[in-house]
């Protein structure tokens, strides 16, 4: 059986706030670690029936980038849900929520003249 690995390295400041996130994967084809400004990692514990999560972002992550990150993450979560359940109606609801979330964020930014 083939084994793959994903490695995540987080550089913290003196207050334990992430300054840099780098990741690499054995099957990525890249020799150098990839930089990221944010990450969300979730595991399902079947015994406890609960999600275990690690959410990190660097000091450099801007608010508009965070909104983009959440929008894209919500959309891809909806795609994953559809692939695993074939439930088109729930997938559409999730995608509608993601779009509404993003549109509301953009409207707030326009109102505050931040974009």
Model-identified regions with their sequence ranges:
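Structured beta-strand/loop patches that form or line metal/cofactor-binding pockets in enzymes
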Residues: 1-9
């Amino acid at each position: 059986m083939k084994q793959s690995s994903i490695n995540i390295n987080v550089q913290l400041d003196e207050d334990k706030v992430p300054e840099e996130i780098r990741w690499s994967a054995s099957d990525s084809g890249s020799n150098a670690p990839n930089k990221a400004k944010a990450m969300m990692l979730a595991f399902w514990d079947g015994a406890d029936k609960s999600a275990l999560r690690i959410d990190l972002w660097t000091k450099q992550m801007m608010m508009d980038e965070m909104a983009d990150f959440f929008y894209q993450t919500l959309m891809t979560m909806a795609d994953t849900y559809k692939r695993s359940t074939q439930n088109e109606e729930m997938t559409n609801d999730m995608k509608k929520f993601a779009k509404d979330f993003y549109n509301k964020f953009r409207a707030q930014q326009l109102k505050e003249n931040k974009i």
